[in-house]
Amino acid sequence: MCSHIAIACGKIAGIGKYDGEKELDVSGRIVCPGFLDAHIHIESSLSVPREFARAVVPHGTTAIVTDPHEITNVMGTDGIEYMLEATERLPIDVFFMLPSCVPSTPLDEAGAELDWFAIDRFYAHPRVLGLAEMMNVPGLVAGDDDVLEKMARTLAAGKVIDGHSPMVSRSTLDVCAALGIGTDHECTTVEEMEERIARGMYVLLREGSASRDLQHLLPGLTPENQRRCLFCTDDRQPSDILERGHIVNNVRMAVRFGIDPVSAVRMATLNAAECYGMRDRGGIAPGRRADMVLVEDLKDFRVLACWAGGELVAKNGGMLRSL
């Protein structure tokens, strides 16, 4: 569809025929919503948030959902506060899931220990979306008081709980779903993906630097279940970002496998936004944030330009805005 996209005050004002104070002709190219990584640990990129943004925004990523459990395992709540402050005023919107398991295991001596009371105050922050991957599945099943309190308070705040339950039994998965876990990014087989979707969960199809699961999960995508699937990286090393890109790499792989390009883009945009309750983004529609990516075509998805809140922030692989 050829059309004008009108932008005002950082949002999409209309789609149709418009005249503007400034106009940009992108005829023959494709405009997609800004890409969204639904689960990532920024610390795994070995970069501070500012440099991470510099790396991924030129690849079309305009928002991420991050779990800062790596820095929090060492610094405690100071780590969360640092990450919240360090991600202000960037050309990428950084949303947070609060670390659920600090330390990661009872025997871990990384330096910090957070119970429900320590993290509860952060739910008032507008960029905190919920509780990050609940790794303590044994504690959940056993009814550990702190685990259940964290989950109950997350749900009471109207937030999302991410799961982390690889290779668990169906009955254990039932417990996870019944207690409010809404996502899982640890699926490595089509069977695991289908089991979670059948229980109402969203499945995050992961293609990162440490875990590369996408090729194993793409065969399980169907027109009926694609709306419950979204993309994530979990972790992304700088060399992989430079060589393959960020979430656009997931989109590209899906299309090359044979997934409809529109469906692949939707998994990188609207599906992720809806999963985490981001009603202001994820589509090219009036009232949505003007986070947009200009790509050469719907095959190779070479990113030509990226807009964040209506501002052109990256072009031809480089940042236009100083950080």
Regions found by a protein language model. Give the residues of each.
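Divalent-metal coordination cores built from histidine and acidic residues
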Residues: A53-G158, E224
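Di-metal (Zn2+ and/or Mg2+/Mn2+) metal-binding site signature of metallo-dependent hydrolases
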Residues: R29-A53
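Histidine-rich, glycine-flanked metal-binding segment
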Residues: M1-P33
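Active-site microenvironment of metallo-dependent hydrolases
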Residues: M1-S3, A8, G16, V57-H59, ...
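Histidine/acidic residue-rich metal-binding segments in metalloenzymes
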Residues: E113-E133, G139-L205, S211-C232, L242-R256, ...
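Divalent metal-coordination and catalytic microenvironments
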Residues: G10, G28, H39, G60, ...
